[in-house]
């Protein structure tokens, strides 16, 4: 056998087409890491008997445990159980007690029992049932070869998770071949690109235990730190000095950890200082307010905002002088500064953020192209306005998202400077 450990095989044409994000694989991978189980490969196959069987046979030559999700339902395209049986040349057998349980579960849920549901009562000879407390699709645990075990779960996330926690985790703790306990942390960064961040921490990226790996998404860069130890405490002790060094080198670019968002960090800083916030939005159309109010408890410091899309609303609700709009245009430093000051005065807050830009795809000029955004942060120590150029290649939604991220980060840095 080339490798030990656990592999994940996710079944469903909808996954290959991108209709559904593969959240099951991510969730299982996190649980395997927490159990200290080596996990080196994930595979996705469509609803096809031959390819599914081939994937299972290939996995049997690499790993000790194969976890599958999907394809356990009653419809003709639910092929996992019969394909696995065919892959290892094992006959399917009906389990009368399982069929009785499936019928009882369907009836208890007020659902009609269809003849096709009977397919779910067939398992390969020698397989044991993994009960499904939330649905009609049972899984199985089956060892078709020496030192190779398959655990199957439905694709419905809530059903898969309940079954995994109740049945798979206890079994994996005993038989999975854990090599230690893995602990991971995520550090989040803003205002720095992935390549620049990687240069600053290049030597730490070469570490083996802990490992440090960069990940980038729109407007956000992350470093995942992972360590393996004999216990969670020993693994955490390996992470602590590396995290401290990363924070030292990156200074204010690091804004939080795994569960933090820029909005939650900004709100926490405001609450700590006993200050309040308002927003004035044009090109983001409420995106700033949405990001802030997505954080539970935001009402303690976030007073509200004005979506001032037209010049008339900028004048009427934010007291932006008409001559500023005529002289500089709505997308300009003077206008966003006036918007921020107007919101701060009208809503009676300590701080205010204002944004105005050209999100596209049309409306740009040579002087003010698509992707140009002006941001202003007004606070007790004055108002600062700046321009950002996000370009026109990413599209309207990306410009709006980047504007929200950059505006919140500007406020975060101002709040840190005052503390």
UniProtKB/Swiss-Prot annotation:
InterPro entries: CinA, CinA-like_C, CinA_C, CinA_KH, Competence-induced_CinA, MoaB/Mog-like_dom_sf, MoaB/Mog_dom. SMART domains: MoCF_biosynth (SM00852). It comes from Parasynechococcus marenigrum (strain WH8102). This is CinA-like protein. Belongs to the CinA family. Pfam families: CinA, CinA_KH, MoCF_biosynth.
